[in-house]
């Protein structure tokens, strides 16, 4: 237990200081190395602590007159273990005290012990008080709660935020170039894997495993029979309206999930762009594993002079950089490290990408704008802005929605926005 708490508090401490969770775990020399049998438990503790950080932070403020930043992360993780995992309380408290010593904070071990024992005595009182605090009950910062409430209304906004507490499903996409969905389902059944089909149209290759497993245990994964991809992300290739023989651009391709799906849906000439060398490496690995071919290039898609040969594309996919507000259950750090002002900087990036790439689209061609955001500023407002700026653009309705298809998170999928723009 002490190793779990020590690693988890070190990672969480970096996140609370503003670093992303992925960078804190695997982001170079300053990241926390997770090794051995306790690594999975430490990761679970961090993810759980971030999902429930609103309540855990509320509890610590209730228990301490003045927070001590040196032990804040340790207390958050320890209270998470006490409240949400069923771990023996004495084991958690003792391990947290020993962890303080291991952190070279032996002078604070009595404080750690006192706060945790106080929580055990007052937990019911704290949970009752927390019911009156929206940040504690909904698990999101105040600005986020207000924005979603204004946008969706109170009931829908609460449904969206409470969905972030649910462990995300493991969704697969069948590679129909190698096997049919039914044959792959038979493969799952023969390997004693239970599965279900998501309740959403347009994702005909999607299968959700009832019990998540490591990638190495997914039947046929290494042979390229399937990919791991959220069901919502699988809609892009459907909405893009692909036809054989087309020239297609995936402008922000990494890690390659949508690129490879495009190649499974139609026989097209595909160019994959991404401005990150390491992320482009993942695109190439996925192409190879699945048995697909595409051109790849490391470049900033918005800078046409750096990569475009002047030949227009029939289809362009713009999976734009965004806040990631639709995928917080997979990346629970997002809601605590993002700031409301980040919406402006992402909005500028998105507008630059759209305006630049529109020039590379042929007349009669279609551009699909995608985000994994649920904020209007990155979605409907961007499309409205684009249509005003570009009179040769028109929106292609999908599911009867005039400005775009807004997919909010639920048990089957994350949150996404899709808008298909056609060049007159």
Where are these regions (language model features)?
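S-adenosylmethionine
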Residues: 1-424
């Amino acid at each position: 237990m002490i190793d779990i708490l020590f690693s988890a508090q070190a990672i969480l401490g970096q996140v609370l200081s503003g670093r992303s969770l992925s960078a804190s775990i695997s982001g170079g020399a300053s990241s926390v190395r997770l090794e051995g049998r306790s690594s999975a438990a430490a990761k679970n503790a961090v993810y759980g602590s971030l999902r429930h950080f609103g309540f855990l932070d509320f509890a610590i403020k209730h228990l301490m007159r003045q927070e001590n930043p040196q032990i804040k992360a340790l207390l958050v993780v320890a209270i998470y273990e006490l409240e949400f995992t069923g771990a023996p309380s004495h084991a958690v408290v003792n391990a947290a005290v020993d962890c303080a010593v291991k952190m070279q904070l032996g002078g604070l071990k009595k404080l750690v012990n006192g706060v945790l024992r106080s929580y055990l005595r007052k937990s019911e009182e704290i949970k009752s008080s927390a019911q009156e605090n929206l940040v504690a009950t909904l698990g999101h910062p105040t600005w986020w709660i207000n924005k979603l409430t204004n946008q969706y209304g109170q009931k829908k906004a609460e449904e969206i935020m409470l969905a972030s507490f649910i462990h995300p499903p493991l969704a697969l996409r069948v590679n129909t170039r190698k096997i049919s969905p039914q044959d792959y389902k038979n493969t799952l059944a023969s390997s004693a894997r239970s599965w279900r089909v998501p309740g959403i149209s347009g994702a005909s290759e999607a299968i959700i495993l009832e019990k998540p497993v490591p990638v190495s245990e997914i039947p046929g994964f290494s042979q390229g029979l399937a990919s791991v991809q959220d069901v919502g992300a699988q809609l892009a290739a459907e909405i893009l309206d692909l036809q054989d023989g087309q020239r297609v651009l995936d402008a922000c391709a990494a890690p390659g999930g949508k690129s490879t799906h495009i190649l499974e849906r139609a026989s097209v000439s595909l160019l994959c762009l991404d401005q990150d060398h390491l992320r482009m490496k993942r695109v190439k690995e996925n192409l190879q594993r699945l048995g697909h071919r595409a051109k790849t290039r490391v470049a900033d898609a918005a800078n046409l002079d750096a990569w475009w040969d002047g030949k227009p594309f029939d289809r362009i996919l713009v999976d734009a950089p965004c806040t990631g507000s639709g995928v917080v259950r997979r990346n629970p750090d997002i809601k605590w490290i993002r700031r409301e002002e980040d919406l402006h900087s992402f909005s500028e990036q998105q507008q630059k990408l759209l305006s630049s790439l529109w020039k590379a689209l042929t007349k009669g061609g279609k551009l699909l704008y995608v985000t994994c955001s649920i904020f209007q500023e990155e979605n409907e407002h961007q499309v409205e802005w684009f249509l005003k700026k570009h009179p040769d653009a028109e929106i292609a309705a999908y599911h009867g929605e005039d400005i775009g298809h807004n997919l909010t998170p639920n048990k089957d999928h994350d949150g996404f926005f899709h808008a298909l723009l056609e060049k007159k």
